[in-house]
Design a protein with these regions (language model features):
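Structured alpha/beta or helical-core interaction and ligand-binding surfaces enriched in interleaved
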Residues: 1-126
Length: 126
């Protein structure tokens, strides 16, 4: 699952058993919330301290996603539910720019690039 929210971009997949290293079987009850920007995970933790505050942000240098949280799938489901309930805007990119400020300018530009790419996909269908 890819998730773009005002706090950042996350790729969420089933965690692997044990220490989560490659080659281990997946753990269907636990997910890895992966990010390319550490501050995105920190913002998510700050938004949901009661759910994610106790989770350590682990660094995996050289990995596709360098920063990760490991959480029970049920906790992640609650985070996503609350994110959905908190939608209070009519333009995601503009709301994200307001939330991120100058520090998040690169993320907002990346959102525009994703938007343009998906617009191209739509145009191929028309």
């Amino acid at each position: 699952m890819w998730l773009f929210v005002r706090e950042g971009f996350f790729s969420v997949v089933c965690a692997r058993q044990g220490d989560g290293k490659r080659g281990r079987p997946i753990d269907p009850e636990r997910v890895m919330v992966r990010a390319r920007v550490r501050a995105h995970l920190e913002a998510l933790q700050a938004r949901f301290p009661e759910l994610l505050g106790g989770c350590e942000i682990r660094e995996f240098p050289g990995a596709d996603y360098a920063w990760r949280l490991f959480v029970p799938k049920s906790v992640w489901a609650e985070v996503v539910r609350r994110l959905a309930e908190d939608i209070d805007y009519d333009n995601f990119k503009a709301a994200t720019a307001r939330r991120q400020g100058l520090d998040g300018a690169a993320y907002v530009e990346a959102l525009h690039a994703v938007w343009r790419t998906m617009l191209g996909l739509q145009r191929q269908q028309l």
